[in-house]
Each structure stands twice: as structure tokens, then as C-alpha cells.
UniProtKB/Swiss-Prot annotation:
It comes from Shewanella woodyi (strain ATCC 51908 / MS32). GO terms for molecular function: DNA binding; DNA-directed RNA polymerase activity. One of its GO terms (biological process) is DNA-templated transcription. It comes from the Bacteria. The lineage of its organism: Bacteria, Pseudomonadati, Pseudomonadota, Gammaproteobacteria, Alteromonadales. This is DNA-directed RNA polymerase subunit omega. It catalyses: RNA(n) + a ribonucleoside 5'-triphosphate = RNA(n+1) + diphosphate. The RNAP catalytic core consists of 2 alpha, 1 beta, 1 beta' and 1 omega subunit. When a sigma factor is associated with the core the holoenzyme is formed, which can initiate transcription.
Length: 94
């Protein structure tokens, strides 16, 4: 397992504070939301995986924002489809 240094990730993001926010968001995606890592897991924890992804330039605040917008769009589309199916079912009953 290669050691990840925070300095390598900071260089990609710009400053420590933004890097911490990006790493936390990405680690949460991996750990809680079930998103697939973009690098080999190598038995690392989600925070280390997130730092390695940032270090390689695979994850930025912009990519996380775009991913979250896509997730919201997909969720909204599913909700609209569900409401349409319910409405159609009611129309068939009447």
C-alpha cells in the first residue's frame, strides 16, 4: 500500500480546507452512497481512496458537483415516472 500524503492532494485542489471538503464528500459517496472507487481499493478506507483519487486528479469539487446534479436529475425523473404511473392507474380505474 502506497502512502498518501495530504500535500499531493492539496496541490490538485488548491488549499487544505477545500481539499478536506472534497475528500469528505467523495469518501461519503464511496462509504454511504455505494459509489465505485475510481482507483484500486487496495484494502484502504474510503478517506484514503478519496485522497488517492484527488491526488491523481480524478476527483475535484466540479466533478463532485456534476455527479450530484446528475443523481438529483435521475431521482427526480424516477419520482416523475412514479407519479405518472399512479396518475395513469387512477385514470384507468375511473
Amino acid at each position: 500500500m502506497a502512502r498518501v500524503t495530504v500535500e499531493d492532494a492539496v496541490e490538485q485542489i488548491g488549499n487544505r480546507f477545500d481539499m478536506i471538503l472534497v475528500a469528505a464528500r467523495r469518501a461519503r459517496q464511496i462509504a454511504v452512497q455505494g459509489k465505485d472507487p475510481m482507483v484500486e481499493e487496495e484494502n484502504d478506507k474510503p478517506t484514503v481512496i478519496a485522497l488517492r483519487e484527488i491526488e491523481l486528479g480524478l476527483v475535484t469539487a466540479d466533478t463532485l458537483d456534476a455527479d450530484e446534479r446528475q443523481t438529483v436529475r435521475e431521482r427526480e425523473a424516477a419520482e416523475i415516472a412514479a407519479v405518472a404511473a399512479i396518475a395513469e392507474g387512477r385514470n384507468n380505474v375511473i
